Curated annotation (Swiss-Prot):
General remark: Hepadnaviral virions contain probably just one P protein molecule per particle.
Activity regulation description: Activated by host HSP70 and HSP40 in vitro to be able to bind the epsilon loop of the pgRNA. Because deletion of the RNase H region renders the protein partly chaperone-independent, the chaperones may be needed indirectly to relieve occlusion of the RNA-binding site by this domain. Inhibited by several reverse-transcriptase inhibitors: Lamivudine, Adefovir and Entecavir.
Keyword hit for Cell membrane: no
Region span, Disordered: 228-259, 283-314
Catalyzed reactions per annotation: DNA(n) + a 2'-deoxyribonucleoside 5'-triphosphate = DNA(n+1) + diphosphate; Endonucleolytic cleavage to 5'-phosphomonoester
Stretches assigned to the Reverse transcriptase domain: 357-600
Name under which the protein is recorded: Protein P
Site (Priming of reverse-transcription by covalently linking the first nucleotide of the (-)DNA): Y63
Homology family: Belongs to the hepadnaviridae P protein family.
GO molecular function: DNA binding; DNA-directed DNA polymerase activity; metal ion binding; RNA-directed DNA polymerase activity; RNA-DNA hybrid ribonuclease activity
Binding site for Mg(2+): D429, D551, D552
Basic residues biased stretches: 239-249
EC number: 2.7.7.7, 2.7.7.49, 3.1.26.4
Length: 843
């Protein structure tokens, strides 16, 4: 007869009418009983041939491809001028006095952040924008390019100008200047007799007014300015002021550098119309565009070969090809859907390329990408805005993967001990938190994103027009890309993007100037940064509480008025160091703080309502007697595991599911097991704050017996059969709790102390979790444990009770500014005879 739910509940001692604990509890450790119950509840892993279920409610499992939804009306979020001040440390010291070593160490980690992986794979530019939405390929291309352009304009990305130079917008940092003044740039050029630079003394090369002067030295490639490979680079001039023929000569002149003034004057003649086929109307209409000639360049049909500008020297050559976009202007329309109709809508399509306000030298940066990008909804609640997903997963894969640094995540009990109080709370929203932290320019070549331009992108998508190397720029294949879909998409995009369509149709390579979200280093750096800032705030306002996890900052104060003044002071401080807060998203919580998915009040912690609702939905849709794919089980366990500490039996109740996931097998929910879990999660108990106190109750055990010391009273008992030592110690702790009702128990067993009951026999783990719920444990060495003698059968000997105070831990929540001293690698005394591994012998 199958085990019914009431019987099962009785077996787990969850009912009040259970027999004496000392008799009932050891039975649950019996392996045979555990095996029979598991078989009865169908918890044995099924090796049946019934097809697995791959979807339960919203949880999808193996072989399922969730098709992401593309929104043609996505708006690109705006990024404020985020610039974390470089004198952050001195500003913090003005605010709070000298910083602690811990705070200094953390702040120095991000000023600037560094990222140098062992191996970086470079992918072709075609892989830059992922073809995530094949139905909306062109729309997705332009929206992604617009997002990247927005990030570049906000100073979050560098734009690769040539192999060894990049430009960016926004305020420069000193380390970006240092790259210019190193021994390899100015000092070398002087040593080799080359001309001095007409650059600003700051070392960052701001854009010169006579923009085109540089273009006699540099020719425009599909990715920006590069040196001409003609006579200038052949080295025959020696030291006569020309460039020397060294391997790295082209890097000596980053884009944006002007040669000496005479050269500048001579080269002014090379200025001409910005794009090959743009008419003179544009210069008359907008003279500023023609003066900043370096905004522009000519391209070619598929933009693969470097193409010189239409300068005086190159016009005579006759073989220069215009940019792919503007080339349509001089061709006959091939159909009603020819792109030339769109190109002829505007006389002035603007520049082919834009350049930043500042230039820096970079390490050698190939015209490749190291990760792909695509767009998704900003979050499940906001589908109107897009979010850029950057896939730098190459750094987390294979033998050369980077092992990311570990950092402390506060556990539930520590969080409750710290934040469960009668304070008033509010939480701050840091806008684009990751993009606050600057990255050293030397890391740029490892974090490259970009695109190969619209012509390549379209050619990849259409099967008819393949790009062959010998076909570059030939008019036969120019119109191959004219399709109805492309025409309609571009026409719609023209209404929102206007002449930027031209700019975005060119190829581009961008490297990260601030830390990107797709790299495992970023969460670590953000956590270090925000915890250091909170530490500074806590020391400045010792009567208040500031705490952070990643970009989630919370402030607590005794009263609402006090909290408001604290909020004003902290906001002003954060703004003064360059941290951007989204004040419209500040949330005032009253006395119940919503943080990290929990509601934390003076009564303790509970999961937030939306999580409880998800759990109810999950049980409603959970099928019984049907094999469920282990990947779905993984997702179910992820949800249930979050709320497990609030249930009677905790994590041990989920152990059968964990076992099936580990074995990668299907799992069948029996009606009894489902009813058991359902009941567990329908009644959630708060996790309470631990209180300090003095330990008066001690427990100890040997494999054959147990002993308790409750105040001055001693008790002992024996087990029917010898048990593993950890199981015996756990039973002794349960007896101590049930006999004394004490919430503070002293034990010498590290496994009981850890409160992880998942490695015990399943039924015992479930029951012990409920009995010991809300119990705090204090470690007492065996030699000093008053319960040691009773456990060995000696009741006559009385060891004096220890004064063993218990202080609740706030765990590794990085709360205190003073970091504990780091222990040396070897402890003072090494115990080789570990009690966990040495078989117990009777005294």
């Amino acid at each position: 007869m199958p085990l019914s739910y009431p019987h099962f509940r009785k077996l787990l001692l969850l009912d009040d009418e259970a027999g004496p604990l000392e008799e009932e509890l050891p039975r649950l450790a019996d392996e045979d009983l555990n095996r029979r119950v598991a078989a009865d509840l169908n918890l044995q892993l099924p090796n049946v041939s019934i097809p697995w279920t791959h979807k339960v409610g919203n949880f999808t499992g193996l072989y399922s491809s969730t098709v992401p939804a593309f929104n043609p009306n996505w708006s690109t979020p705006s990024f404020p001028d985020i610039h974390l001040h470089q004198d952050l440390i001195s500003k913090c010291e003005q605010f709070v006095g000298p910083l602690t070593k811990n705070e200094l160490r953390r702040l120095k980690l991000v000023m600037p952040a560094r990222f140098y992986p062992k191996v970086t794979k470079y992918f072709p530019m075609d892989k830059g924008i992922k073809p995530y939405y094949p139905e909306h390929a062109v729309n997705h291309y332009f929206k992604t390019r617009h997002y990247l352009h927005t990030l570049w304009k906000a100073g979050i990305l560098y734009k690769r100008e040539s192999t060894r130079s990049a430009s960016f917008c926004g305020s420069p940092y000193s380390w970006e200047q240092e790259l210019q003044h190193g021994s390899t740039s100015l000092n070398d050029t002087k040593r080799h007799g080359t001309e001095s630079l007409c650059a600003q003394s700051s070392g960052i090369l701001s854009r010169p007014s006579a923009g085109s002067a540089i273009q006699s030295k540099f020719q425009q490639s599909r990715l920006g300015l590069q040196h001409k490979q003609g006579q200038l680079a052949n080295g025959k001039q020696g030291r006569s002021g020309r460039l020397r023929s060294r391997v790295h000569t082209p890097t000596r002149w980053p884009a944006g550098v002007e040669p000496s003034s005479t050269r500048c004057v001579n080269n002014l003649a090379s200025r001409s119309a910005s794009c090959f086929h743009q008419s003179a109307v544009r210069e008359k209409a907008n003279p500023s565009l023609s003066t900043s000639k370096r905004h522009t360049s000519t391209g070619n049909a598929v933009e693969l070969n470097p193409v010189p500008p239409s300068s005086v020297g190159s016009q005579g050559k006759g073989s220069v090809l215009p940019c792919w976009w503007l080339q349509f202007r001089d061709t006959e329309p091939c159909s009603d859907y020819c792109l030339s109709h769109i190109i002829n809508l505007l006389e002035d399509w603007g520049p082919c390329y834009e350049h930043g306000q500042h230039y820096i030298r970079t390490p050698r940066t190939p015209a490749r990408v190291t990760g792909g990008v695509f767009l998704v909804d900003k979050n499940p609640h906001n589908t109107t805005e897009s979010r850029l997903v950057v896939d730098f997963s190459q750094f987390s894969r294979g033998t050369t993967r980077v092992s990311w640094p570990k950092f402390a995540v506060p556990n539930l009990q520590s969080l409750t001990n710290l934040l469960s109080s009668n304070l008033s709370w509010l939480s701050l929203d840091v806008s684009a938190a990751f993009y606050h932290l600057p990255l050293h320019p030397a890391a740029m070549p490892h974090l490259l994103v970009g695109s190969s331009g619209l012509s390549r992108y379209v050619a990849r998508l259409s099967s008819t027009s393949r790009i062959h190397d010998h076909q570059h720029g030939t008019l036969q294949n120019l119109h191959n890309s004219c399709t109805r879909n492309l025409y309609v998409s571009l026409l719609l995009l023209f209404q929102t993007l206007g002449r930027k369509l031209h700019l975005y149709s060119h190829p581009i390579i961008l490297g990260f100037r601030k830390i990107p979200m797709g790299v495992g280093l970023s969460p670590f750096l953000l956590a270090q940064f925000t915890s250091a800032i909170c530490s500074v705030v806590r020391r400045a306002f010792p009567h208040c509480l500031a705490f952070s996890y990643m970009d989630d900052l919370v402030l607590g104060a005794k009263s609402v008025q006090h909290l408001e003044s604290l909020y004003t002071a902290v906001t002003n401080f954060l703004l003064s160091v360059g941290i951007h807060l989204n004040t419209s998203k500040t949330k005032r919580w009253g006395y119940s703080l919503h943080f990290m998915g929990y509601v934390i009040g003076s009564w303790g912690s509970l999961p937030q309502d939306h999580i409880v609702h998800k759990i109810k939905e999950c049980f409603r849709k959970l099928p019984v007697n049907r094999p469920i794919d282990w990947k779905v089980c993984q997702r179910i366990v992820g949800l249930l595991g979050f709320a497990a500490p609030f249930t009677q039996c905790g994590y041990p109740a989920l152990m059968p599911l964990y076992a099936c996931i580990t074995a990668k097998q299907a799992f069948v929910f029996s009606p009894t097991y489902k009813a058991f879990l359902c009941k567990q999660y329908m009644n959630l108990y708060p996790v309470a704050r631990q209180r300090p106190g003095l330990c008066q109750v001690f427990a100890d055990a040997t494999p054959t017996g147990w002993g308790l010391a409750i105040g001055h009273q001693r008790m002992r008992g024996t087990f029917v059969a010898p048990l593993p030592i950890h199981t015996a110690e756990l039973l002794a702790a349960c007896f101590a709790r049930s006999r004394s009702g004490a919430t503070l128990i002293g034990t010498d067993n590290s496994v009981v102390l850890s409160r992880k009951y998942t490695s015990f026999p399943w039924l015992l783990g479930c029951a012990a979790n409920w009995i010991l719920r809300g119990t705090s444990f204090v470690y007492v060495p065996s030699a000093l444990n008053p319960a040691d003698d009773p456990s060995r059968g000696r009741l006559g000997l009385y060891r004096p009770l220890l004064r063993l105070p218990f202080q609740p831990t706030t765990g590794r929540t990085s709360l205190y500014a003073d970091s504990p001293s780091v222990p040396s690698h070897l402890p003072d005394r090494v115990h080789f005879a570990s009690p966990l591994h040495v078989a117990w012998r009777p005294p």
